[in-house]
Amino acid sequence: MIVKNGYVWNGTIFEKKNLYIENGRFVPYSDTGPVVDATGLFVMPGWVDSHAHIIGTGMKVLTHDLTKENLFDIFKKIRESSENFIIARGWESLPEQQILDKANELKIPVLLVRKCGHVAWINNYLKEKIGKRKDENNLLFEKEIEKVWNFLGDEFFSKAFEKGQEEFLRHGVTQVHSDDFHGVGFETLKKLLKNSKIRIFEKLYTYEPWNYEFREFGISKIGGIKLFADGSLGGRTAWMVYPYKDTGGFGMNTLPDNFDEVVKFSEQRHIQLNIHVIGDRALAEVLGRLEKNKVKLRHRLIHLQFVLKNDFPKLRNFYLSIQPHFYFEDIPLLDNVSFELAYPFLQMHKSGYMIAFSTDSPVSPADPKYVLEYAFKMGFTREDAVYYYTEAGSKIAGYQCGKIDIGYCADFALYDNDPFEENPVAVFVNGEEVMRR
């Protein structure tokens, strides 16, 4: 393939040049294959989202978005629709009791998921279906929510996967480090990965990794193990050193009982751990446990919103998936917590740590421009921000992608306007066109 006359991002500026592609990679020269006329178009490496949820992003498209819809309207229309399971996501504070009472009157399952995805409310009908007692709370926290996903079925998850892919590709994202193993069957997940248009590094959420395959599936691979050390800040389940001012609680420790066993397995098999840590107490616990296990691999930590000063230097030994926009989204929540370091992402950059940007979609939009806007506000330069959203993310997954250069994966996008303001007109993954607007 030849991509002719495009303005190609070289890491600093756009320069006019031709690109040559063979076997899914950029090569010095080729005169075979199709010719893509990129005259007047900008050519960017495909964005790499180092932490998101493809199925979750698709579910947001297929279900109700509480930032755009009203629950009363949703319940009112239910009699006129064929909907037999109401899933709505996006609440910050629990809906009023009057609305919850309305949900409890319905004889179909109702699941209302908080924006963060770590807390959910279920109606009485669904509570009975998953085996909770009548006198138990209708709120579900963390791993409890997994019981509900098992009701949805693989056909639904397959549709959600397709919608999620479309959403990322629409924004020029060609690689996602995804966390999808929630309810979907493993055989179905393997098929989805094998046939994916997008390059996926799957972080398999399991406490029993020895029961699963870690290998390549098409252009994608199951390459990491996903674990949670705590929950979310807004849900008051992030595990903190100092108590939450409104509840007096410290959050939740969600590390599995067999954490050390999983660590040893990952070290023996050379599989990357991907550990969700938001609170400073969660991070301190994880760092201590990994040190105790004398890990030799460079594992990955995700989020890192609060860090103890003594723990900050230890982060040099890990890959760090961060979300600059979370600081700005979480400002209303910060008065409720005490901390030493909060969202020290620019400090990580200045210290030379191995960081990569991500959206955590569907918690936040799947659009890289959204993340970049807040990265610039935080103080990152355009050049550094692009690097952390392309090549850096690819490196921490073991791929040679995210850069338009000889030997790199031919994952790129074409834009007819400023790539930092508009979506692409076409997207290519592994040298194949996968999206055209």
Across the structure, where does each feature detected by a protein language model lie?
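Non-cysteine beta-strand/loop elements that form the S-adenosyl-L-methionine
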Residues: 53, 219-237, 318-327
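Generic beta-strand/beta-sheet core signal
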Residues: 113, 178-181, 203-205, 223-228, ...
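Divalent metal-binding segments
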Residues: 2-4, 9-10, 14-22, 26, ...
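His/Asp/Glu-enriched, well-ordered alpha-helical/loop segment
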Residues: 267-273, 288-299, 323-417, 428
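Short, small/polar residue-rich loop motifs at catalytic or cofactor-binding pockets
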Residues: 13-15, 220-221, 420-422
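Acidic (Asp/Glu)-rich catalytic clusters
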Residues: 192-195, 214-220, 264-268, 294, ...
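Phosphate/diphosphate-binding loops
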Residues: 195-226, 298-305, 309-310, 333-347, ...
